[in-house]
């Protein structure tokens, strides 16, 4: 596997983010448009996204490691924002690329990290969720671009564990009282 063309401008910040993830004992995965570019069809994206299994108490340590990798906060109130939203808003200093790290704590997120795999992209290796888990996360986000991303991942991986996808998407749909999370993507698997 090589770095998809639309993602080549992100090699430097992605390398720094992966180094940060490695320093965090690989307790996370790269998600979002970057993951879609490797597991589905490459597309334009404006930022890098990751999910780390971390409590807000671990944020100071993550920020210190991030600084050593050339990654800095995008806001002066990063601790307050992280406590309220469970997201770290960061920036790769050299490239200016935005990096958002979600702080995961749910059992599903623990499974995503445990099932994650390292993909060799030639000039770098990155830790990604399985195609199934990326689809589940995209179904929950449920923006129009996420539905397109889901289709590209399905097209690239014909032997998906649809039972796992259905189970988790329906579980989140029930909790969020949004049945369309599953019904909007169900036909894509046929």
Regions found by a protein language model. Give the residues of each.
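Compositionally biased terminal segments of proteins
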Residues: 1-190
């Amino acid at each position: 596997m090589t770095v998809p063309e639309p993602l080549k401008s992100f090699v430097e910040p992605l390398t720094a983010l992966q180094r940060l993830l490695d320093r965090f004992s690989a307790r996370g995965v790269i998600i979002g448009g970057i993951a879609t570019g490797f597991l589905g069809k490459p597309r334009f994206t404006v930022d890098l996204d990751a999910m780390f299994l971390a409590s807000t108490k671990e944020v100071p340590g993550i920020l210190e490691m991030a600084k050593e990798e050339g990654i800095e906060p995008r806001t002066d109130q990063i601790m307050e924002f992280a406590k309220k939203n469970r997201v770290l808003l960061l920036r790769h200093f050299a490239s200016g690329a935005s990096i958002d790290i979600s702080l995961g704590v749910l059992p599903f997120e623990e499974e995503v990290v445990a099932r994650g795999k390292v993909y060799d992209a030639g000039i770098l290796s990155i830790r990604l969720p399985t195609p199934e888990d990326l689809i589940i996360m995209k179904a929950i986000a449920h923006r129009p671009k996420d539905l397109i991303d889901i289709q590209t991942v399905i097209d690239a991986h014909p032997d998906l564990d649809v039972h796992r996808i259905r189970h988790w998407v329906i579980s989140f749909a029930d909790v969020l009282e949004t049945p369309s999370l599953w019904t909007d993507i169900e036909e894509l698997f046929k």
